[in-house]
């Protein structure tokens, strides 16, 4: 099977991007990269705790100051195919990554109630405890501000949308099928 040289992942919080990344890395040998890692590095450089409630405004600040595709611009030089880019949250990041020949964007999604339940299970610092708080945080990630997170607009650019509302086995099958369909 011919595989895309660079695969990008986008999707809302707790949709299964991490599990999708594991499948691509462990089963297909993709080298993992994350735009969030670029933010974590910047947060640490500034002496900030690299948690979601710090990273989101930091990312918005960087996009305003240096352009909406800045995180992808910083990462693109580190990519050596086969590579996986996780945490794509702005259409300008997709635009930058589309400069890589054969780049494919996968959007991972699941119903909000299931994603909230997954979020509670993983219990990361700063994760929403109530469904109301979860929805509120999600609304903040879907803004019209070109320098902010625009998850819905980013997902709309996906080459393939994967629904992750079933089992891990189902997700694995969907991911491998998507990679095969997108291979060149």
Please identify what each model-predicted range represents.
Residues 30-96, 132-135:
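ATP-dependent small-molecule kinase phosphotransfer cores
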Residues 27, 76-124:
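ATP-dependent NMP and nucleoside kinases share a basic, alpha-helical "lid"
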Residues 69, 122-174, 178-181:
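Small-molecule kinase domains that catalyze NTP-dependent phosphoryl transfer to phosphate-bearing small molecules
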Residues 12:
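P-loop (Walker A) phosphate-binding loop of NTP-binding proteins
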Residues 20:
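Hydrophobic positions on the alpha1 helix immediately C-terminal to the Walker A/P-loop
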Residues 1-5:
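Extreme N-terminal, non-catalytic leader segments
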Residues 17:
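Conserved lysine of the Walker
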């Amino acid at each position: 099977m011919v595989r895309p040289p660079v695969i990008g992942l986008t999707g809302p919080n707790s949709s299964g991007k991490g599990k999708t990344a594991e499948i691509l890395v462990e089963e297909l040998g993709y080298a993992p990269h994350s735009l969030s890692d670029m933010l974590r590095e910047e947060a640490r450089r500034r002496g900030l705790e690299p948690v979601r409630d710090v990273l989101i405004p930091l990312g918005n600040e960087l996009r305003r100051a240096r352009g909406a595709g800045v995180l992808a611009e910083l990462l693109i030089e580190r990519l050596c195919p086969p590579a996986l880019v996780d945490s794509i949250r702005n259409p300008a990041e997709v635009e930058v990554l589309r400069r890589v020949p054969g780049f494919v964007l996968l959007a991972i999604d699941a119903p909000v109630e299931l994603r909230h339940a997954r979020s509670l299970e993983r219990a990361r610092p700063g994760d929403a405890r109530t469904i109301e708080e979860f929805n509120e945080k999600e609304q903040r990630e879907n803004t019209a501000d070109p320098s902010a997170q625009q998850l819905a607009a980013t997902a709309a650019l996906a080459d393939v949308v994967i629904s992750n509302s079933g089992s891990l086995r189902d997700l694995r099958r969907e991911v491998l099928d998507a990679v095969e369909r997108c291979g060149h």
